[in-house]
A protein has these predicted regions:
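Hydrophobic "anchor" residues on beta-strands that sit immediately upstream
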Residues: 4, 30, 73, 96, ...
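A generic "cationic amphipathic patch" detector
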Residues: 31, 42, 86-87, 141
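Short, well-ordered secondary-structure micro-motifs
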Residues: 42-43, 86, 109, 161
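Active-site cofactor/cluster-binding pocket
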Residues: 53-114
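A glycine- and small-aliphatic-rich helix-loop capping segment at beta-alpha/alpha-beta transitions
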Residues: 19-21, 49-53, 90-96, 134, ...
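Sparse, context-dependent recognition of short Cys/His-centered cofactor- or disulfide-binding micro-motifs
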Residues: 32, 58-59, 74-75, 81, ...
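Anionic-ligand anchoring segments at beta-strand to alpha-helix junctions in alpha/beta enzyme folds, i.e.
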Residues: 1-69
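A structured phosphate/pyrophosphate-recognition subdomain
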Residues: 1-7, 14-27, 103-168
C-alpha cells in the first residue's frame, strides 16, 4: 500500500485503514513510506509502538525486492505517477489499484485493476472508512487504526471546517 511522497496524515491514515482490511482478510500487506521524509512522524511512532504493529512499514527499495507477479499495489491519496512514494515500484507491478479523492490529473496512473475515484469525498481516509464499513466488523478495527483514519479526515477537512458532507 503506497501513498504520495512526503506522506501526510491522509495518505498514511488511508493506508493504515487498508492495512486493517488486509489484516482482517488475512492478506499480507505493508505500507511503503519514507520514514524520514514525511509529515506524520508522531502517528508513525504511535503505530510502531502499538501491539502487533511493529512491522507495518517497508521502504520502496525493499518493496521492489519483495514484489512478485502476484503482488497488488494499492495507491492511496494520489492518482499521479510522479507523486507516488516509489515510482519504480509502481512501474514494476502489473496489478495496481488507486483510491483517491483528488480531481483526475492529465497524467494519471493508467492500466489499473481498480480505480476508486470520488472527488466529492473529503479525503482518502473517508473513502477507506466507507470501504471498512462494508468489509470488516467494528471490533476488528484497532484503536490506533481508527485514530489514523480520523487523523486523515481531520487534516483534509481542516478540522471538519471544509469539504465535509453527510458521508463525512
Amino acid at each position: 500500500i503506497m501513498g504520495h511522497r512526503m506522506a501526510d496524515l491522509d495518505a498514511l491514515g488511508s493506508a493504515v485503514g487498508l492495512l486493517c482490511l488486509c489484516r482482517v482478510k488475512e492478506r499480507p500487506a505493508r505500507i511503503v513510506i519514507d520514514l524520514q521524509k514525511n509529515a506524520c512522524q508522531s502517528l508513525i511512532a504511535e503505530l510502531k509502538a502499538a501491539p502487533g504493529c511493529e512491522d507495518l512499514f517497508i521502504s520502496g527499495q525493499d518493496a521492489l525486492v519483495e514484489a512478485d507477479n502476484r503482488s497488488l499495489l494499492i495507491v492511496v491519496d494520489t492518482n499521479r505517477p510522479e507523486q507516488v512514494e516509489c515510482r519504480p515500484l509502481l512501474e514494476s507491478i502489473s496489478r495496481v489499484a488507486v483510491i483517491h479523492h483528488h480531481r483526475r490529473a492529465a497524467d494519471y496512473i493508467e492500466k489499473v485493476v481498480l480505480n476508486l475515484h470520488e472527488p466529492f469525498a473529503s479525503s482518502a481516509s473517508e473513502l477507506v472508512t466507507e470501504l471498512l464499513q462494508y468489509t470488516v466488523e467494528a471490533g476488528d478495527i484497532l484503536p490506533v487504526e481508527a485514530q489514523a483514519l480520523l487523523s486523515g479526515i481531520v487534516l483534509d477537512t481542516k478540522n471538519f471546517g471544509v469539504r465535509t458532507g453527510s458521508r463525512t
